Design a protein with these regions (language model features):
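OB-fold and OB-like single-stranded nucleic-acid-recognition modules
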Residues: 6-171
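N-terminal export leaders
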Residues: 1-3
């Protein structure tokens, strides 16, 4: 996957590492704990009114970027309420993603960009979509966040060198 990233532009998400920091534009905060109704009933998980009302609107989410064994697919990554590491080679489709997982998508003109994993709690702002979406590989997501084009930027040469260094030392 690292070589594929070398062939495409590499994105550095310009996310806010400090959850107390004020975003540039005030979007309502949506918490992962507000995604579904609890307790879970006999019909399984049901989306909450707060999640349904946020559909199509700009929201601010605070959580963790999922660390994927093979790296995220270009132009997208998973975002969860807790740190998660996926081992696609060992687990296949039986991953440990929580129900409140968001598929984050870069702007369409950034769809070829690879996104390096960002550790720690981060905040993202974008337009929320709610509903079943199936990817070409068959993975189904129920909640998606479309980032605005200004949410990401290309890496400078020093950031890129640091990224390559971390790939050499990741375990």
């Amino acid at each position: 996957m690292a070589f594929q990233c070398l062939q495409t532009a590499i994105a550095q998400t310009s996310v806010t590492q400090d959850p107390g920091a004020t975003p540039m534009t005030a979007a309502p905060t949506l918490r992962f704990s507000d995604f579904y109704l609890f307790p879970v009933g006999p019909l399984g998980l049901e989306s909450s009114p707060a999640l349904r009302q946020a559909a199509g609107k700009q929201v601010l989410l605070t959580g963790y970027m999922v660390q994927q064994e093979n790296g995220s697919k270009p132009g997208q990554f998973f975002f969860t309420p807790r740190p998660v590491q996926m081992s696609e080679h060992a687990d296949g489709d039986a991953d440990d993603l929580p129900p409140a997982t968001v598929l984050v998508k870069l702007a369409p003109d950034q769809a070829a960009w690879c996104i390096p994993h960002t550790r720690g709690l981060i905040q993202l702002q974008g337009t929320l979509s709610v509903g079943r979406q199936e990817a070409p590989d068959g993975r189904v997501t129920w909640v998606q966040l479309q980032l605005n084009p200004e949410a990401t930027r290309g890496m400078n040469v020093f950031e890129f060198a640091g990224y390559l260094h971390t790939l050499q030392h990741s375990h």
